[in-house]
Amino acid sequence: MTQKSFPITPEFLAAANVTAEQYVEQYQQSIASPEATDAFWAKQAELIDWIKKPTKISDVSYDLEDFRIKWFEDGELNISVNCLDRHVKNNPYKPAIIWEGDHPSLHKIISFKELHEAVCRLGNAMRKLGVKKGDRVTLYMPMIPEAVVAMLACTRIGAVHSVVFGGFSTQSLGNRIIDSQSKLVITADEGIRGNKRTPLKANVDRALDMDGTDSVSNVIVVHRTGNSVPMSGRRDIWYHSLVDGESQYCEPEVMNAEDPLFLLYTSGSTGKPKGVLHTTGGYITYALSTFRDVFDVKDDDVYWCTADVGWVTGHTYATYAPLANGTTTVMFEGVPEYPTWARIGHIIDKHQITVLYTAPTAIRAMMKEGDTFVRESDRSSLRLLGTVGEPINPEAWDWYYHIVGGGKCPVVDTWWQTETGGIMLAPIPGTVAMKPGAVMNPLYGIIPEVIDTDGVALEGAAEGNLVINGSWPGQMRTIYKDHARFLETYFTEYPGYYFTGDGVQRDEDGHYWITGRVDDVLNVSGHRLGTAEIESAIVAHPATAEAAVVGMPHDIRGIGICAFVILKSSETATESLKAELNRHVRTEIGPIANLDAIYMVNVLPKTRSGKIMRRILRSLAAGQYVGLGDLSTLADSSVINELVEVVKTERAK
């Protein structure tokens, strides 16, 4: 765990929204008592335009016999009004969305007024198709403006959207439609990313051939590429012909704060999909307040969260929070490497982006290609960088800070989950010097605890399981149609707490470091080692670009350490390099971190959101090459054969 820290530049501090002293004072006030926490969230709720202001702030019990999570329960509002109408009144022609297409020649700027009209037209059309408050609508779309229009149109009329990432398979899509019993599907003819097409409409057709999808009465299809797709006469409707004749105003549905807002399915490693349910008032309050705090938001910011709308980050921090705040949000259809790795920098310059929020996977991928592509752009418009999705190793953090940000932009390393609705731990910029790889501090109203396996809360510098003491407005309310699974997963192991499933270290300064999933903590000879810590040590070696570490059976140590390593393109895999890597890790962490197996590979098995599927690597490390479980969420299933060959060859030596 590095203790190197980087102070915030004086220029940034001078303009920061919050000082270190203010953070400490406000944080302590926000957690002083349950009444103080309610008072804090009542104040944050004033950022929202309510139809009926809430008088009851929270009603929460983690007692399994009397369980409830309710926030602002007597309040009424409509989220689309908060994202659109109030800005149309004050600043109608401000860009709401800057859309950058897959090809660099394509871009579109959509004002709040134009977005409002598009949302109202689709909302009216959906009502005419019989979609009512509480009905589920599945979106299976590329990163085009109509995806955001569809999300907001659902909120306009009180429908519950379930966005399925456009890269998911027919089977995954079908399972989510069946579980949600959606009435309507909105899709496009095809998606296009990196000049490669995805047959979205054809996938929808195949998904709707599955048993249990009879709930779907219509499919709305956006014309994106223009390639011919089969259209079923009664069921399928072209988006543009549907909305063209509709009114530019749609009466917003009055929603109770605890009415469902959206479902978002997380892929468990096995079993049926897990539908995370978020509700209306608490979610938007938490999204907006954390957005303003973590990103030090200014009125003239051009903000780019690179997440696809199919993921929770794309919901909260690419769509709802920026639009609710009246901030211009950038939406990118393509991939960082098309047409070259310089694309991200060129987009930053083209649209004068001020805040960039992206994932360590993308940062490491760019870093692997070297600095030249990044230096093709100026990037002087940037003032703040963010990272999300997984722990960032200090080397990638360092490269992001110095090369992408030029050493002048604070990096906010954020920890949160689909389940939490918004960011929970992050260094609010201007309040604390940054430590590469640390998520640093809790946000207001959030009380993290470090708990050992016996359920004892640890004080001071400690390592253990991360739990949250108490509730917060953005918290998920249930797993759709499976409340028992919700209680069992998050509230049973450590009674009275929300169990995150993540491991954490708290250092001597009281700052937090996420060590990876609890099942990614290795117990080696009775010593606990976080895989993130070992991976960081490996990637600190100049020859390596990326690494994934898993446990493997070991005759002596019980659990051994197995590393899958991607080298930089200029390096060659040799036995001497393996030995050097092992020496390096032992030096960085200690002899206990001896690497028992090192596999030099070209690729790692990743989901479409960029997360490494470690259970596959665990099976391979144990010599199991078949029966690897559900591979439907893999971005590229062909990598499995390649990995199997590498492991077999090495184990045969």
Curated annotation (Swiss-Prot):
Record has Lyase as a keyword: no
Matching Pfam families: ACAS_N, AMP-binding, AMP-binding_C
Enzyme class of the recorded protein, top EC level: ligase
Keyword Nuclease in record: no
Residues binding Mg(2+), per UniProt: 539, 541
Matches recorded under PROSITE patterns: AMP_BINDING
Protein name: Acetyl-coenzyme A synthetase
Species whose genome carries this gene: Psychrobacter arcticus (strain DSM 17307 / VKM B-2377 / 273-4)
